[in-house]
Amino acid sequence: MEKNIAVIKGDGIGPEIVTESMKVLDKVAEKFGHKFNYTQLLMGGCSIDANGVPLTDETIAACKASDAVLMGSIGGDTTTSPWYKLPANLRPEAGLLGIRKALGLFANLRPCLLYPELAGACPLKTEISAKGFDMLIMRELTGGLYFGARKTEEVNGVMTATDTLTYSEDEIRRIAIKAFDVAMKRSCLLYTSPSPR
């Protein structure tokens, strides 16, 4: 098997973690006769430093042309990094949001596993943690607060902030379908968070 992998080492500890991950992939390739072709790309703060923007069209094109993307952390210390003095659309995380949209990466799957043996270390109530649990939390990544309009204005002499949470019917449908598909494969119950009214 031969695969092309776009590698975005990112910022902070990202380069160290991705470099070690590539070593693991190389061992897998060696053991099982695979070949991984890596294309090194920039995104986030390192791309701002090199290109003036957190995500370039070239990086998007290379990711789209690859079989997979291996990516490290994006961004840095918001209190000390000069990146966070930039407008929001030029900060490192704008690259992350841009690549998600460009590649259609809308579902973030976050497993949460607690073995019964570790229940005593869990901050949840004993009746919840005693038997352990295996949950998968799915989060939509390309709509809602990530891309909602924000504004600050004076209303009746008081400063007011608005941050909109908007989802299209298609965005809701695709995340619901993904959640049902994953739940069926896990042979578990599916819960959805209620919509605020």
Where are these regions (language model features)?
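Glycine-rich phosphate/diphosphate-binding loops that line cofactor/substrate pockets in enzymes
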Residues: M1-E2, A176, F180-L189
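N-terminal phosphate-binding or glycine-rich loops at protein starts, especially the Walker A/P-loop
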Residues: E2-F32, F36-N37
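Buried hydrophobic positions in well-ordered alpha/beta secondary-structure cores of metabolic enzymes
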Residues: D11-G14, D67, M138, A179
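N-terminal beta-loop-helix "entrance" segment that forms/cooperates
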Residues: K35-T56
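N-terminal glycine-rich phosphate/adenylate-binding segment common to multiple enzyme folds
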Residues: D49-T162
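Active-site glycine-rich loop that binds ribose-phosphate moieties when present
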Residues: G157-F180
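Conserved small/polar residues in nucleotide/adenosyl-binding loops
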Residues: Y191-R197
